[in-house]
Amino acid sequence: MDIQWKKQITKSFSLTGFSIKADAMKCIINRIKNEGYDITQLIDNLLKNLDKSQYLQTIEGCFKLIDTINSSDAIEKEALKVIDAFNTPLFNFDSNSKQFIKSENFDRSLHGSSNSKSDLYRKRYLKVLQRTERNDYFSTPVLASDKLKNEYQTITPLSSLLGNTGRKHVLGTISQIEEDQFYIEDLNTNVKIDISKAKFEFGIVTINSIIQASGEFIDGVFIADKIQLPPTEERCETLKFLQNIDMFGERPQKKTMEQLIKYEKEKEDNSILFLSDVWLDSERVMERLDYLFGGYKDCPPFAMILMGNFTEHPLINGTQYQLKKYFNQLAMVIQKYPNIHQFTQFIFVPGPTDPTGSLLNILPKFPISNVFIKDFISLIPKSTFTTNPCRIRYCSQEIIIFRDDLTNKMRRHCILEPSQSCDISQHLIELICSNSHLCNLTLEDKPIYWNYDHAMSVYPLPDLLVIGDKSNQYEHSRADGTYSMNPSSFSTDYSFAHYIPANKQFYYNKADRPSDEIEDDDDDEEVENQNENENENENENENENENENNDNDKTQQKDTQGDGDDNDDDEIMIDENEKQKSRKRNKKVVIITKEDELNKLEDDEEILNSLDVQQQSENHADNNNNNINNNNNDDDNEDDEDSNYNNIESEVQEVEKEEEEDEEPIDNDKLDEFIE
């Protein structure tokens, strides 16, 4: 049976111009045996799905393509692909054939040779040069007339400037070989350049930027009168020139791409969230994440891309292992929402200070070390930890993500101030797109692994460029077909970006502030408690005033009883008077104590007055007791005793009047102010 199958397979492939090797033959026969395929139908499917643009293709790839087309789950898995920086394909431009050629066996070591450093700059320059020469402004027609030729310009090599008079256009990398002197370099030489009088309008120019300068070469110095960044190229034009070369990585085959485009249009509700600066060690940030997940629990996003830094402060000196605890806390929050846990793909991009196995902040940055995230991955299987920068392919769209504070860096190192007519973010994006590089600062300012500089390339331009920056949110839609955006810092204002790939629309949102609402409620409770305390104090004061009035009424009633009252009533009357005076003294002391915060001198005088009144009252009370004892011993002196008693009462009343006159009226506003 196997021999008959082999003959039939060999004959079918040879009729279509293909030859099949022994290992491919074995793979097909195993499929027929194990899965019961009809051999004729299987061969037809294989031949239909062979990519004719490639001369060599594996049978395993064809089977994978067939399974992908026939399975909706496989399409969903193929919809999102993450390409880390160290798996980015390398293509070198061949100046002779004017094509990009893939380099299969390039040096992948982190510590490149000296040639790697020089090749780094050459590759950057050639990539921009070939694109600029194809620009309409520099593409002179072959059979053009002299008049028509004057409408076009050419890029003059720097080595041809000597003895070549007139206004010229040059393209080169600006550098500073000598202090206070700028140079412009190309592949062969460098010349001094004077930019003091140059007109510059759009973009940012830093040391190491590739610029296009116009001017004259005089006495060994190129006097530039105009400087601009190289022209960009529309994405569709670049793809047409590349002739289906996959410089991005993980590009699916034609049949799969058709299915992915169909899937992309059908899934209109699929969304991708972008968050930057997600501090997992901050309680308030975790609260906002919890609140954010709660808002998407019924309609989970297709993917969530979380960019570092993942801690507020760098974890150094042995504290790196705390990151494991923080990711476990995040896993617990995600597990609270089953839909998000089941359907959302989480992608983590490290920030500048995150521990990634290297103490040096060199680009590309490695993923977060597995020792910190292995528990998280076991709890959240649909999670991917990738490099910084990284590339993401969603169906037919290519996305580049880079987490760095580029705005501040470029401002510090710019040598030509950008115009104020546009936002600084527009100048930054123009620099990135025109130089086809994410960060073209000097290697001293921003070190890069020499052998992996191609991972920082932005050529061809992606559909979406995401820069995770601490600056304010921005989004720019460019004429060349690239959409750029910055979700801003989630830890600062809890802002994030909501992207819908089906219609390429962005929505900027902010996580609500539940803790602030709680704080507002707490503030309201405190205000209510203060009001209640004020009301209680007012009620106490009213009760005290009522007690005073009642005591005064009782005293007046007892004063009117006259001589007919017996000695026991006299003692009760005197005791009531003493209690009344004591209450007044205590009340007065309390008021003085509160007023002491406002005016200490007046309080001291009032306290002394109150003490004098207290002493006088005690003396009157002693005299009163002595008179009562004398009345008990001598009943004959009853009239004298009554007169003495009346005299005592009159004296007490006079003292009370003096106290009331001396006592300042209570300022209720000040008292309420003091209580508050």
UniProtKB/Swiss-Prot annotation:
Q: Keyword set for this entry?
A: DNA replication, DNA-binding, Nucleus
Entry-linked Pfam families: DNA_pol_E_B
Where, per UniProt, does this protein localize?
Nucleus
**GO annotation terms (biological process):** DNA-templated DNA replication; error-prone translesion synthesis
Q: Where is the composition biased (Acidic residues)?
A: 517-550, 562-575, 633-643, 651-666
Task: Tell me a GO cellular component.
Answer: epsilon DNA polymerase complex
Biased segments, Low complexity type: 622-632
Q: Where along the chain is composition biased (Basic and acidic residues)?
A: 551-561, 667-676
State whether it acts alone or in a complex, and with which partners, per the record: Consists of three subunits: pole, pole2 and pole3.
> What is known about what this protein does?
Accessory component of the DNA polymerase epsilon complex. Participates in DNA repair and in chromosomal DNA replication.
Stated family:
Belongs to the DNA polymerase epsilon subunit B family.
Write down what this protein is called: DNA polymerase epsilon subunit 2
